[in-house]
Amino acid sequence: MKYKDLRDFLVQLEQRGDLKRVDIEVDPHLEMTEICDRLLKQAGPAVLFERPAGHTIPVLGNLFGTPERVALGMGQTSVSALREVGKLLAYLKEPDPPKGLRDAWEKLPVLKQVLNMAPKQLASAPCQEIIWEGADVDLGKLPIQTCWPGDVAPLITWGLTVTRGPHKSRQNLGIYRQQVIAPNKVIMRWLAHRGGALDYRDFCQIYPGQPYPVAVALGADPATILGAVTPVPDSLSEYQFAGLLRGAKTEVVKCLTHDLQVPASAEIVLEGYIHPDEMAVEGPYGDHTGYYNEQETFPVFTIERITMRRNPIYHSTYTGKPPDEPAILGVALNEVFVPLLQKQFTEITDFYLPPEGCSYRLAVVSMKKQYPGHAKRVMFGIWSFLRQFMYTKFIIVTDDDIDIRDWKEVVWAMTTRVDPVRDTLIVENTPIDYLDFASPVSGLGSKMGLDATNKWPGETTREWGCPIEMDAAVKTRIDHLWQQLPF
């Protein structure tokens, strides 16, 4: 699906019957979460709440509530087609040298397309049609959701945070939740390894005590949003990648407050600064684990201007016990990860992040085993390859005869090919999501790998079992007889 901006995307979804409008009053406090949660569990449509209680700005929910809509947002017609996106990223991450002149000519269009997708800066943009500044800056005018009964305050969930580090020419885009603590202040919850936090840390080291420019875009086009959660190579900006997905350059405009560039078609933009001496305790909030998280201290983002389109749309979501929207995103992005991993580890035949595993905490891998101990090499490789897998707690590795997307097959491999002492790998004192309260120390815990492959000589001294399989000729004969049998 090709589209210009979020509004164009919504028009096309509505034409497909994949967006429904709600014209009765619904409260952003809890009620929208309950409706979106039920819709998501039914693989239902995106929803536009046209009359949020106490507000005039409509709320968009459940936009990425099915893997198919994620694929459409990435410019593809099906979830399986996302493998092609992964192949492109794998090539851009580590391009192979051309094997000859013909191969070089065949690769030239791809490289040319990437170079041609540098963002296009506009002098003026729809996202700056309306400007709030000074005393007019009031987050209370926006229909920001409170998702769960125990949440401490309204929470911005789909904010596309724009930062730039002092050592980088390109900007970083990231999705970080933001707790509202005042009409012009939110808490910026970014974990230490995320791009925005790293940019901020580098800035503070070079310019100690100086305010750090930040912008948050709400209601950007889907390609730009999804570019921020995809493992884009460091040599490629998220804006460039969004252009590749969309098939057209990402249009940006300079903020009115500082020099950061934001998506020109964004519905709402928050502009301001983080002051290094201002921190606040964030949470508790219900999150993607299905629990309320611990409180933690993060920087405060002070908003100096809010700009927006005429008749803006506020894009929101909730996180909770899987499945939620992040889990659905994980299902779709899983198809992007497979070619990336296969480029680095050619023995991998499939890779699966079960949505019940809180998006990334459990991974199952199938492989063509080549030597004793091979499964452990794959485990360590996955943990260290992409930042997205830094917090993966459990990795199960099977042979390629197992359909790892069928849990019955995985359990069979685990119960018949695993000796707990020999085949369990425990790694202590590794980075863990601080939301994981099961770890003994916040942000630091252990990981476990389970080798559920057939064991080779050197891994066992016993004769290994041979799987039962019916004679092929008998199966063929019964296939022909089946329609004649009385069942």
Swiss-Prot record:
Localization: Cell membrane
Protein name: 3-octaprenyl-4-hydroxybenzoate carboxy-lyase
Keywords: Cell membrane, Decarboxylase, Flavoprotein, FMN, Lyase, Manganese, Membrane, Metal-binding, Ubiquinone biosynthesis
Cited function: Catalyzes the decarboxylation of 3-octaprenyl-4-hydroxy benzoate to 2-octaprenylphenol, an intermediate step in ubiquinone biosynthesis.
Enzyme class: lyase
Cofactor: prenylated FMN; Mn(2+)
Residues that bind prenylated FMN: I175, Y176, R177, R189, W190, L191, R194, G195
Native organism: Nitrosomonas europaea (strain ATCC 19718 / CIP 103999 / KCTC 2705 / NBRC 14298)
Gene Ontology CC: cytosol; plasma membrane
InterPro entries on file: UbiD, UbiD-like_C, UbiD-like_N, UbiD_bacteria, UbiD_Rift_dom
Stated family: Belongs to the UbiD family.
Record: residues binding Mn(2+): N172, E238
Cofactor binding note: Binds 1 prenylated FMN per subunit.
Reactions catalysed, as given in the entry: a 4-hydroxy-3-(all-trans-polyprenyl)benzoate + H(+) = a 2-(all-trans-polyprenyl)phenol + CO2
Pathway: Cofactor biosynthesis; ubiquinone biosynthesis
GO MF terms held by the record: 3-octaprenyl-4-hydroxybenzoate carboxy-lyase activity; metal ion binding
EC annotation from Swiss-Prot or TrEMBL: 4.1.1.98
Membrane topology: Peripheral membrane protein
Predominant location category: membrane
Protein's GO biological process: ubiquinone biosynthetic process
Annotated Pfam families: UbiD (PF01977), UbiD_C (PF20696), UbiD_N (PF20695)
Record-annotated active site: D287 (proton donor)
